[in-house]
């Protein structure tokens, strides 16, 4: 992977005019981010009501028909599902709506192959994938800050023009992302490991919670660990079916390896054997996940603060931390079932933990370190 931010940040300004074709979560978030930068944004969607909702949210102006939009944009962002990328690219190029084109699909080899088959002009096309998202979908879930500090993969082809890469890189930077470069095949193998297979694993675990598998009352004992493991399983099933089907081979390889580890752990537990080796490998893997701003993982001290479940309590806590000069690096809230309180887990640098504890106790909170 080659990071592109340093190469392009001063080389080209953000595109002045952008067409976003597809106004779901990602497309509308791109539009909102660009609008904050003063970019003129045009919106298109097969469902005109969805496009109009995005427009009502301030994402741009609706274009009812791409056939009437010749030359409307410098860059067209194709924010459609993987299976629709090639056809949308062909339609947009036939209508000559932009100089350069990119997409946001989370798989790259299949759309590229289909675009070749359709005879698309690949010299002005930069396959792309912003690695950001939410469990929710649709324009109402969009956020202008969705891409801040997030990796945005660009996968230019041998025939892609350098000016196209520069324009799309500038667009990613304008959205606040950190653009990196990878070839399509490598991209698909890597996202199978870090994105696609984890979604299947989360879905498999979450499926165990549906009747009749889950015993009555068991979910009353659910804690933050279960929520962490299953959170992404709430994603759009239809979209994820497309994603997984488009990257089936690499995802299947990762799942087979995970299944092997789980089967070995099950055999070990059935025979009262030790599973420490797997758990240790898991800890080592977590330690390799990039930390804040994509840098090396850092070790933080977690301070637990009991907070009342009422309006303004969390803001009061943050204000107290700020007044003490403490930067909260991360926060997680665990609610107590049936009780009007929760526990805020505040991650801070070890050298600031003492100051935070003192500030919390002075503010009347119960704390635990």
Region roles according to the model:
Residues 17, 40, 124, 151, ...:
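Residues at the starts of beta-strands that form the adenosine-phosphate
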Residues 46-47, 105, 334:
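Residues in the short beta-alpha loop(s) of Rossmann-like NAD(P)-binding domains
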Residues 88-140:
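Rossmann-like NAD(P)(H) cofactor-binding subdomain of soluble oxidoreductases
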């Amino acid at each position: 992977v080659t990071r592109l931010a340093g190469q392009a940040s001063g080389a080209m300004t953000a595109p002045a005019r952008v067409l976003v074709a597809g106004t779901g979560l990602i497309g509308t978030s791109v539009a909102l981010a660009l609008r904050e930068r003063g970019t003129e944004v045009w919106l298109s969607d097969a469902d005109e009501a969805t496009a109009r909702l995005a427009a009502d949210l301030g994402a741009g102006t609706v274009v009812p028909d791409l056939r009437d939009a010749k030359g409307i944009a410098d860059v067209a962002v194709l924010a459609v599902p993987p299976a629709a990328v090639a056809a949308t690219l062909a339609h947009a190029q036939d209508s000559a709506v932009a100089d350069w084109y990119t997409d946001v699909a989370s798989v790259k080899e299949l759309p590229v192959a289909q675009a070749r088959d359709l005879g698309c002009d690949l010299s002005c096309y930069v396959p792309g994938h912003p690695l950001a998202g939410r469990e929710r979908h649709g324009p109402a879930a969009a956020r202008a800050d969705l891409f801040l500090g997030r990796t945005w993969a660009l996968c230019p082809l041998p025939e892609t023009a350098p000016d196209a890469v520069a324009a799309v890189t500038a667009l990613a930077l304008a959205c606040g992302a950190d653009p990196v470069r990878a070839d399509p095949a490598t991209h698909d193998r890597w996202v199978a490991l870090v994105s696609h297979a984890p979604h299947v694993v989360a879905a498999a675990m979450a499926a165990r919670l549906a009747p009749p598998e889950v015993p009555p009352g068991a979910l009353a004992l659910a804690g933050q660990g279960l929520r962490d493991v299953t959170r992404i399983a709430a994603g759009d099933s239809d979209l994820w079916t497309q994603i997984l089907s488009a990257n089936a081979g690499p995802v299947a390889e990762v799942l087979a390896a995970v299944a092997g580890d789980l089967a070995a752990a099950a055999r070990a537990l059935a025979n009262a054997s030790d599973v420490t080796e797997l758990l240790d490998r898991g800890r080592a893997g977590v330690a390799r996940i990039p930390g804040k701003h994509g840098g090396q993982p850092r070790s933080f001290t977690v301070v637990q603060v009991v907070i009342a479940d009422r309006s303004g309590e969390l803001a009061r806590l943050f204000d107290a931390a700020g007044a003490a000069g403490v930067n909260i690096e991360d926060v997680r809230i665990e609610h107590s079932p049936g009780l009007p309180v929760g526990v805020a887990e505040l991650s801070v640098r070890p050298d600031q933990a003492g100051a935070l504890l003192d500030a919390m106790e002075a503010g009347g909170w119960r704390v635990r370190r």
